[in-house]
């Protein structure tokens, strides 16, 4: 299966926000057609990515289910590639917990995480002037080897098709429920992570 993913940016500013609110959002009689006719929601093309994933064998599942899982994996890879190439599209994820110089987050192979990837640790702040949420870098973290959550779409099928030793490792990684990052010994509970530098390759 091959997934082609296009990334668009919504053109937006305070003037558009105010006009849309007046014409549509705060108008009780407004309809979806009014939103379309307002011509306020415009998109700018940012980039494109492609990724492939093979259909695995599994006698316990239908071909439709297997094809669906392969499609999901291809889409996940394509989205992960877009995040690497376009900083504004990078997901900000909450830190799940901190302990002994490590931070943990519920992201993994589905999001394209690989060993050695570098992440920023961010603090959420309210800008007193704009009243908008901003994120300030307060630290760094690096993905630990063999501590990456195996949450890939159709993970059970991949495990079923792997050799015994590899399948055992994949199963162990699947049961982690988190990815482990090396950081300093500060308490980053309530903070966030965002990809800074990609070290590993997202395989097709």
Predicted regions and their residues:
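Surface-exposed, polar/charged interaction patches used for macromolecular assembly or partner binding
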Residues: 1-204
